Amino acid sequence: MADLSPVIQPHREGGSRYGYTMFPGLESEAELSLSLASTKTRSYGSTGSVAAPLAERYIEHCLSPSDTLQGIALKYGVTMEQIKRANKLFSTDCIFLRKSLNIPVISKKGSLFNGLGSLDSPENETQDTCSSPTEEPALAESHTVSIDSSAKTNQPIVRSDEELSAKDFLQRLDLQIKRSTQAAQRLKEEDDLRHDGSYATCSYQH
């Protein structure tokens, strides 16, 4: 009597998990779907993503007695939670125990060849912005002086009406004093002449 049981053939292309397969067509489709799912699609040219990668760098801020966490966050455009997370602060009062804080700043990093190369180096990730308190007013003062000097050179000098009126008033006052002095001298000379004439007339009559 012949044996009619199905013969299990070994899989020629590497086999399945146990080395044999009952449905080679279905297994090939499953392997194909798994391979397509695990394969990362690449995009080239204009089909690539235009969104630039974001990188987080830190700026060192030197603390002063008047600094507050809210003021620092508003100055750099970040949230207080980001500053706390970057410096591992548990409360806002802990900033007075430090000399400086690391401020997280998110910046776009330029890339070459779809992310294969980066223009920014890790050495440039941290930027030191600490400066002494005496240097900041000096820089601000020099900046204002330069602005004032440039404004003076670009614009003609125009005197205000108050200065002109004060100068005119002083000139008029000097002129009035001079005229009154001349008038007083003239009156005095006329009185002297009149007195001399009356004295001469009296002496002639006698």
Curated annotation (Swiss-Prot):
<dbReference type="InterPro" id="IPR036779">
    <property type="entry name" value="LysM_dom_sf"/>
</dbReference>
<feature type="domain" description="LysM">
    <location>
        <begin position="59"/>
        <end position="103"/>
    </location>
</feature>
<dbReference type="InterPro" id="IPR018392">
    <property type="entry name" value="LysM_dom"/>
</dbReference>
<protein>
    <recommendedName>
        <fullName>LysM and putative peptidoglycan-binding domain-containing protein 2</fullName>
    </recommendedName>
</protein>
<feature type="region of interest" description="Disordered">
    <location>
        <begin position="184"/>
        <end position="206"/>
    </location>
</feature>
<feature type="compositionally biased region" description="Basic and acidic residues">
    <location>
        <begin position="186"/>
        <end position="197"/>
    </location>
</feature>
<dbReference type="InterPro" id="IPR045030">
    <property type="entry name" value="LYSM1-4"/>
</dbReference>
<dbReference type="Pfam" id="PF01476">
    <property type="entry name" value="LysM"/>
</dbReference>
